[in-house]
Regions:
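Glycine-rich phosphate/diphosphate-binding loop of Rossmann-like nucleotide-binding domains
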Residues: 1-20, 149-242
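N-terminal small/polar loop signature for handling phosphorylated ligands or for N-terminal nucleophile
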Residues: 41-55, 217-258
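Glycine-rich phosphate/pyrophosphate-binding loop and the adjoining helix
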Residues: 129-131, 135-186, 193, 338-341, ...
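Flexible, glycine/charged-enriched surface loops at secondary-structure junctions
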Residues: 30-36, 196-204, 228-241, 336-348, ...
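Glycine-rich phosphate/nucleotide-binding loop
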Residues: 251-350, 354-361
Length: 397
């Protein structure tokens, strides 16, 4: 490796798996070169979360990062870890600095069949990560009156629109988005489509939301027509827009193999539907892609808290490490591509094949054994599963 990967360590059971993966599947086989940042909650607390900002800035410098799952603290975690304050989600902080779009895709393996019979290829879900209800202002209306949307320009000019004349109690909400953020989202989707050779589908509700959702539709179409149409034609790819309800119906009948671009809330909901229908969150990859060409790979799941507490009690765990392994392989493959190191990209491919062939041979963790169509699977503990993958990898190298 000529350029280092930015390595972001994490929390709880995934931190344990992180070390096992490095020790058993990476360090014995490649000259691993990383710039290490400890995003474990204790060190984030020690540095007042500066380490998260430093890790994101390092990603801008080197271009590719791999991240372990991390705790986003709530009140219980504040007490448990004796935190100075309620720190923000590290993913949110990194996403804001890199201005990225999150792409999630299921890891498809024989023996773990999707609930939707006709899904044969992964569906990559792209979620716009800015604005809408996640940056809203809400109000409870407790007596009769009117709610208005008011815009005041810098020179004092006002525009007013009546939202609702309330005769009785109710609720109201104001939300927004930024044209620049929608443009950035569209570019990320189209660039990633070219990168991964997939079509793009996008849905909104512009028939009802004739300004808000219509803006999303218009931005996507304009950017596609002016910047990507020729490149897509050359690559044999298509961009398809329809109403969100029509897109959902089409997704259920499709065989997969495309990028489904979603507005923030749609993406929040549909990513869980897609991951659950494909089998498991522990079998979902996640990559943050910025329009400037920075990549940050991680597993789509959390820190597996329940297994970590079992581990601390000295009890055996059977924790699925597949998505975390694929975070490493995704980052190594991208680093190999950018540095022109075919050897590194080939190693990433082989490690993925070794992981999938281990499951297909009937050796797997407990969560997969519960949903597999393979008869009499062998349930392995966390370490033994990684060692079984190492055995398969050694045969390939």
């Amino acid at each position: 490796m000529t350029t280092p990967l930015v390595e972001m360590d994490g929390d709880e059971m995934t931190r344990i798996l992180w070390k096992m993966i490095k020790d058993e599947l990476l360090l014995p086989f490649i000259d691993l070169n990383t710039e290490y940042y400890d995003l474990g909650l204790n060190y984030r607390n020690e540095t007042d979360d500066q380490v998260t900002i430093d890790a994101a800035e390092a990603t801008k410098k080197y271009g590719v990062a791999v991240k372990c799952a991390t705790i986003t603290p709530n009140h219980a975690r504040m007490d448990e870890y004796d935190l100075k304050k309620m720190y923000k989600s590290p993913n949110g902080t990194i996403r804001a600095i890199l201005d990225g779009t999150v792409f999630r895709a299921p890891i498809v393996v024989k023996g773990i069949e999707p609930c939707v019979r006709n899904w044969k290829k992964p569906i990559t879900l792209a979620r716009h990560a800015y604005g809408d209800i996640y940056k809203n202002t809400e109000m409870y209306i407790d007596r009769p009156g009117k709610v208005e949307l008011v815009y005041t320009s810098e020179d004092g000019e006002e525009k007013r629109s009546l939202v609702q004349e309330f005769k009785a109690p109710g609720v109201a909400m104001g939300m927004h988005n930024m044209s620049a953020s929608i443009e950035s989202f569209a570019r990320s989707c189209f660039n990633y489509a070219l990168d991964t050779k997939q079509d793009v589908w996008f849905g909104a509700k512009d028939t009802i939301s004739k300004t808000y959702d219509a803006k999303f539709k218009e931005v996507f179409q304009t950017i596609f027509d002016t910047e990507f149409k020729d490149k897509f034609e050359e690559a044999g790819l298509t961009y398809f827009y329809s109403l969100i309800d029509d897109i959902v119906a089409r997704v259920m009948k499709a065989e997969g193999g495309f990028i489904w671009a979603c507005k923030n809330y749609d993406g929040d909901v549909m990513s869980d539907m897609v991951s659950s229908a494909f089998g498991s969150l522990a079998m979902m990859t996640s990559v943050l892609v910025s329009p400037q060409g920075y990549y940050e790979y991680e597993a789509a799941h959390g820190t597996v808290q329940r297994h970590y507490y079992r581990h601390l009690e000295g009890k055996e765990t059977s924790t699925n490490s597949v998505a975390t392994i694929f975070a490493w392989t995704g980052a190594l493959r991208k680093r190999g591509e950018l540095d022109g190191s075919q050897e590194l990209s080939d190693f990433a491919d082989k490690l993925e094949k070794a992981t999938l062939s281990t499951i297909e041979s009937g050796k797997m963790t407990k969560d997969l054994a519960l949903i597999t169509s393979i008869e009499n699977p062998t349930v392995l503990n966390s370490r033994d599963f990684i060692l079984a993958i190492r055995e398969a990898l050694e045969k390939m190298l």
